[in-house]
Amino acid sequence: MIHKRILVFLIAFLPVIISACSDDDDDDLIGKWYRVSDMDGLARNYASSFTIGNKGYLICGNDGKNRLSDCWEYDMERDTWTQKADFPGTARNSAVAMAVDEKGYLGTGYDGTNYLNDFWEFNPTTNTWAQKADFPGSGRYGAVAFGVNGKAYIGCGYDGNYLKDFYAFNPVANS
């Protein structure tokens, strides 16, 4: 009788014991930092970035000697970097970037001499850049930006003075 109880106990708890001992690599990564592949481009600071779907985009920046205008796409599923079409505007650092409706946007920044206020759209499907209406605020760098409900927002930053103004951009109306 005691052997039957032990057998029933083992049969009942064996799946729990086995599943508790299983190792799922994905679980090991939840809530932890882990290294992914290094970008193939130049090391840099003051770059800009946005995400579309499961891909991250890194644009422009400064390598310590020059301002950059390259664009890189990180594919999180493949853990790979691919160079995309270079940003056609003035090379810069400290620009803002955001995604709105599956397109990326980049604008403002500093080219070493001028505070910039131009604004550009990146289409990842066609790998092309198109200039959009200039940002109506003063040229600036170090601003903040985000995309919400089909609009891009840019504000704050520095143009010789610290700023707190905000503007919204409607991609459909290009204004």
Residue ranges and their predicted role:
Residues 5, 18-19:
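Hydrophobic, helix-prone linear segments
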